[in-house]
Amino acid sequence: MDPVTVSTVISAPREQVFDYLQDIANHSEFTDHFMVDWHLTRIDSVGRGAGARFRVKAPGNRFSWGDATFVEVDRPHRIVETGRTGKNNRIRTIGTYELAPGASGTTRVRFTLETAPATFADRLVESLGARGWLKRKNARSMRRLRAIIEDGEQRGARVTVAAG
């Protein structure tokens, strides 16, 4: 599937936005409308190596568990997470958050999600509307991220090691 990219502009300094995003426990707050049942993979949820498992609430998704682990954390510019999802965790995923300074102290956040389906069946399932669905859900996540950082609104539950 072609990469899915969404972005938003947040009225906050880039360092503040980065500090929020580099804690994977915070990600459940702005993605819980389609990613649920979060569990951290280690106690330290900040920085390189931090990870989580979760279920993706997608229509017709029989194999809903996925995971993500931060593999690159370049303060305050970029965070890269890799993971797996789908049947037997055979679909590789790469998510990249890129933060750029904007006008008047704002921050432009761009999130790109790439998937690498392993089989013809996985590619077929993705071709049946997954790209549009992911774009809509991730665009909503960016709006929620902006509301949380700017106003403290639309907060979901923060995940813990034993689930949140």
What role is predicted for each listed range?
Residues 82-140, 156-159:
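Beta-strand/loop substructures that line and gate deep hydrophobic ligand-binding cavities in soluble
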Residues 1-45, 163-164:
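Hydrophobic ligand-binding cavity/cleft-lining segments
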Residues 20, 30, 72-73, 136:
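Conserved catalytic core of Hanks-type protein kinase domains
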Residues 15-18, 139, 143:
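Amphipathic alpha-helical segments that line or abut small-molecule/effector binding pockets
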Residues 3-5, 63-68, 90-95:
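Short, surface-exposed coil-to-beta transition loops
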